[in-house]
Every structure is written in C-alpha cells, then in structure tokens.
Amino acid sequence: MRKALVRQRTSALKMFAAPTSGWIANQNLAISAPKSLQGAEVLENFFPTATGIEIRRGSSLYATLGGGDLPVTAIFDYNNGNNKRLFASTATTIYDITVVSSPMNYRLSTGSDEIITDGGDYIGQLSTGGLEVVEGLSGGDWIVTQFATTGGVYLVAVNGQDPMQLFDGDQWFAIDDGDIYMLLYDAETAPFVENETLTGGTSGATASIVHVEDSGTTGVLYITDVVGTFQNNEIISSTSGSATADGTPQPYYVGITGVDTSSLSYVWSYKNRLFFIEKESLNSWYLPADKIGGVATPFPMGGEFSEGGKLLIGTSWSLDTSGDGGLSEQCVFITDEGQVVAYQGISPDTAATWSRVGGYK
C-alpha cells in the first residue's frame, strides 16, 4: 500500500502595525477602529517610538556602593557648566560616583585563599572606597532639586529623616537651624578632624567642626553651633587639631528656622523660591525668594483637601495658556489620596498675586 505524501507545512506572513502607542491594557485590541490606538497587549523588552519600536538595551555594572550589602536608594546629578557630578546613595551614605576606578569590589587571591599582608590587610579594592561624601545617615530616600540663586548653584536634598543636605558644587553641608561660619587658620601644628569641638584658647569660644579644608599649615574650618566670640590670632584646638586663628568667623550659610529640616520629605522650586513638604502631614513650607536658608514660612493645606491624607509631592507645572493669555506656571500640590490643588502667583505671602486656580481628583 502506498503511503500518502506528507505535504510540507506552509505559513502565511502576517503584518502588524508597530505598537507606537505602547502597552495598552484598558481597550479591546481585537476591535479595529479608524482612530484606534496602535498598541500592544504584551510589550516586553521593547520601547515605543514615534515611528515604531526599539529593543531595550542591556546594562553593565558601573559602581558598587560600599560593601555592596545595601541597596541603592537614589541616584542624582549636579550640572553647572563644566562642573558635572553624579551621586548615589544607600540608607547610610552618599557617594560621589562621577569617576569610579572599578565597577566592583575585589580581593586578590590564589585559588581558594585570599592574599593577606603581614599586617593582616587584604589586597584589593572597594569600588567606591574614599568616595563617601556624606556618612552616618538615617535614611536614603532622597528627593533632590537643583536650585540657582544670585549666590551660586546648589543641589538641595531632603529625605524626611536627616537634616537637609546642600551641595554647593564643591562640598556637602548639613543644613539645620544653625548658621555655618568660615574660619581661616594658619600655623597648623596638627590637622583638624570633622565632627569635633573647636575651642578658642584665649576666648574660650566653642563650635562644632562640620568641614575642613586643609592646605598643610593653613586652611579653612567650617563651623556651626558657635558659642562665644573667637578672636584673631588666638590658638584654636580640637581633640585632634591645633592652629592659630587667621581672623574671626565669617557667615557662610544661613540655617533654616521655623521647621526641623529633618521633617522635610520633598523639595521643589517655584518662582525662584524653594518649597518643601513636611512628612506625614498636609503642611507645606517655603523660603524667601532667591534664598537657600532663612525663616521657613508654613503654608497649611488641610482645608484644601476634603479627603485628608498627607502631601506626597509638589511641583512646578507650566501650561500653554493662562487667564492672562500667556504661558502660565503653576505650583501644584498632590496628596496620597490622589487629590491635586494648583496655585498661581508669586508668593503665598501676597494674597493679591496668589490664588487657587483648580482642584482635581
């Protein structure tokens, strides 16, 4: 008996329009309409573009923060002309990862045995060893904004647990209700160390050292919590350091009063003014225009949100048109209940130029 020949299976080519509208889960994709969106029910490892889709690119390890045992909580940058910095944080530390010599931590070994020096030290490298710029933190969920004033361009960071952090393009400073002063010194006999108490040998004045710029026998101390009056040419000393004061302390940064900066969980700028959200509340705060310090003014918003909750984020929102017929920049507040309130104007201090323009859900 002859067997029937098995015919080769064929398949027809079917063309589908590229899902330029991306992933769509709230429409029936089986129904075609003249103006229906060109989307996909499943879109994995692809990104939609205006003309088609492109495959998701891969990734490579750039840096390992600390020992690699804590997750990365935030990545943020500073960009001011040629001064470009990249920072990353864990729950305890902020690192400057602009330049990283090795993406991973490693130790030299011979087979299963690691090489150890006579002093008991391992031979190897930490990816971000020496790149710590802020340490001893309680939280790492940083919200950051870059803010320019007539005095400089700054990175302002809050996390609702630690004092506000300020990066001035060179150094980081913790900003609380205490002012920061700059004190020059010379004739150094022993180097100063941060977080120690500075004492004036003649005046008896004291202060906390928050940052040190050491140039050998001369340098600059940045101090806060000053009690008393330091004198020029007196011996100044701490547990570790000693030198001669070259002048008297000069104001460097003004602290923020009126609110504990450790309670601020969100920051943004609007009309050349910094706004903040107080964590677990419906309270917002703002600083004077063109300032990174000073007296913070409360802007309570409990009466604006009928469903209560807490403020989650705030932002500056620009519209194409306004009541004046031109571009409109609005200050927007959003709660965890999904309510949105928008304001327009110069400052909440001035009722004549500050008004509520909408509430949304």
Regions found by a protein language model. Give the residues of each.
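Beta-strand initiation motifs
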Residues: 102-106, 126-132, 171-174, 243-245, ...
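N-terminal beta-propeller domains
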Residues: 1-104, 112, 126-131, 259, ...
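Short coil/turn segments at the loop-to-beta-strand junctions that recur within blades
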Residues: 137-141, 179-180, 260-262, 360-361
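Autoprocessing Asn-cyclization modules and mimics
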Residues: 103-122, 173-252
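Inter-blade boundary loops/turns of WD-repeat beta-propellers
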Residues: 80, 97-100, 160, 169, ...
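Surface-exposed extracellular loop regions of Gram-negative outer-membrane beta-barrel proteins
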Residues: 333-360
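Aromatic/His-enriched, Gly/Pro-containing loop or helix-boundary segments
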Residues: 127-160, 220, 253-257
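Hydrophobic or amphipathic alpha-helical targeting/insertion segments
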Residues: 144-178, 233, 264-267, 275-276
